């Protein structure tokens, strides 16, 4: 089963927004552009350094790639916090990738979490087991879109990992829930979240935690019956997940 970004073909030609532009003509979008634009839609926004990893280019090339998107009216960029610039889709860019989600600068209060979830995704996608199992990432926005009403109970995780039913795959047919934790929550709240996820048909509940959040999540995961605790994997987030200056 392909990754999400390959499920959203982007029109290869896009007319520029104004006929008065000096480079009037059509901008040809390549596969890399499609991957990047769909990633921005899925993940709300992306900082340049992680976008470079996602596109498999040197970080200094991202500026030019984003400039092409911006000139085409598909994306916007800005300095939202200490560290690299950020990029996000415009409404035209969101329409281009085929979604009706909001297209706007990410809220400053959510930057750290958005960065951490994208870094977690890149971390998982870089693992050999991911490639061998042809796993794919189902983002929070897609999960929320699939549960539009109050008739769909249950905690919505930060993402799901879907493992297709490939013969010989140790994870064939499994669905994992992914939770990204940056700061410690009250123990009772973490236990309620884990309990809600255990009640859903997830084979694994994967917690990727910043160092500050690791102890409480580890403790909460150990407070369930052994067969339930065995479904909860607690791991440390990669250092790239943390905002500059974060502990």
Residue ranges of each PLM-predicted region?
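Short glycine/proline-enriched coil/turn segments at helix->beta-strand junctions
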Residues: 56, 125-126, 199-203
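Short catalytic-loop micro-motif centered on adjacent basic/acidic residues
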Residues: 177-179, 206-207
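A short, highly charged nucleic-acid-interacting micro-segment common to nuclease
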Residues: 101-118
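Non-catalytic C-terminal interaction segments of nucleic acid-processing enzymes
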Residues: 2-21, 25-39, 47-48, 184-192, ...
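Acidic, glycine-rich loop-and-strand cores that form catalytic or ligand-binding grooves
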Residues: 120, 124
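Generic structural signal for residues in well-ordered beta-strands
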Residues: 75, 137, 232-234
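Nuclease-adjacent, charged terminal/linker segments that flank catalytic cores
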Residues: 1-105
